[in-house]
UniProtKB/Swiss-Prot annotation:
Its cofactor is Mn(2+). One of its GO terms (cellular component) is cytosol. It comes from the Bacteria. This is Phosphoenolpyruvate carboxykinase (ATP). Its EC number is 4.1.1.49. It comes from Caldanaerobacter subterraneus subsp. tengcongensis (strain DSM 15242 / JCM 11007 / NBRC 100824 / MB4) (Thermoanaerobacter tengcongensis). Keywords: ATP-binding, Cytoplasm, Decarboxylase, Gluconeogenesis, Lyase, Manganese, Metal-binding, Nucleotide-binding. InterPro entries: PEP_carboxykinase_ATP, PEP_carboxykinase_C, PEP_carboxykinase_N, PEPCK_ATP_CS.
Amino acid sequence: MLNLERLGLINFKNVYRNLPVAKLIEEAVKREEGVLVNNGAFNVYTGKYTGRSPNDKFIVDEPEVHEDIWWENNKPISVEKFEKLYNRLIAYLQNRDLFIFDGFVGADPQYRVSIRVITEYAYQSLMARQLFIRPTEKELQNFVPEYTLIAAPRFKAIPEIDGVNSEAFIILSFTKKLIIIGGTQYGGEIKKSIFTLMNYLMPKKGVLSMHCSANIGKDGDTALFFGLSGTGKTTLSADPERFLIGDDEHGWSERGIFNFEGGCYAKCINLSREKEPQIWDSIRFGAILENVVYDEATRELDYTSDKITENTRAAYPIDFIPGAVQSGIGGHPKTIIFLTADAFGVLPPIAKLTKEQAMYYFLSGYTSKLAGTERGITEPQATFSTCFGAPFLPLPPMVYAKMLGEKIEKYDTKVFLVNTGWSGGPYGIGKRINLEYTRKMVSAALKGELDKVEFTKDPIFNLNIPASCPGVPSEILNPRNTWKDKEEYDKTAKRLAQRFIENFQKYKEVSEEIKNAGPKG
């Protein structure tokens, strides 16, 4: 018995639960939700929402959770508004087919959460199946979901009545254990609202939830890669020498680390087999593509086209990646890499961090966005997203930072800051740091080869820079050396250091040791 009545779901037509991949694709094709393309993947156009819509995400302001939530970063909606909108959504689903995926989030059985995803589109059920953790036949028999997510993209909110900002909404009710999504078809909303849920639940169980990728070496040494979109998390953790645990969301418990998911959600703009063979080969029958341009006649994909969006995506199960760690579990991390793409060209390509510096750079969550070049603006913008994942944090940042500091200390984890951005000048003048060099620096950090080298202190950013690194020209390790105009470097570096200092002023409760670990300006 699915017991959908307890959710108020009645008078629905057919219910399709945990259908196999081929059947879900068959249903999706039949309903014209998308098309099969020449590599066997299922490609959908998601309409006007081709990315997440942070302005349309709300947390229900319930007395039981009010004190916990970081309201500076999360939008509240009243219980009354939520219930009215929920009842309209339930009424909308009457007389419609429903697709259900029952499964789990969290690969460690001790911490896993059972979820039910109810969708009106077959392909979104396939997406949930490929991204989350799939249950065994036995687990399905007595399955009871703790949390339920309902996604109905064709149901649109009315902002004036519903107290939301547009026709789209993503609303989490932690007390009712419900997530509802409407008006947007973008698959990332399903994935990231479940991540937000885990960011709420896990710290309460003593588990640090993290927006990072993870892999493991042949000797069983685990590494984590933190970084915002476009910094190289997926690319650098897909290393043929190492085995992928997961590409995006993990927990760190007393037992080690574990993937929250059972799949990957990779960016595919400009994807090529040469640069990213693992991702390229994973896009096949069973994978879902979002908003990739294709030729109607030949069904050939054009990964270079950003005609619909630059945020083109592929969702596929992790077992499509050769050598992926099937259990989704690893030991305590030996090394953590914070990735940043600095378009000002002033941060070193690699630096070793102390525990205090690790907390400082974790709370800062820095990268830079390139301004729209079509308007002739080439000045990059500094972006700070706390804990490298601000949009998904329901609790205050210090909750996560404190846990990170404690765990780094307890398990003696080494932390490095790696800049995958520009060198020799800012964006437009300098050039992007060679990916091969970045790979060599990451490899040296993971193998402990940087333990043996000398370090110099960067006077502006207060960072320890290695004097040498195997396979990397020493002159690029100190960014000042790569600039022709040293005065211009000093000015630019001080300007960015000042941005760090200004951004960090909001963390009033941070100790002096952590404050002093940051740039000096």
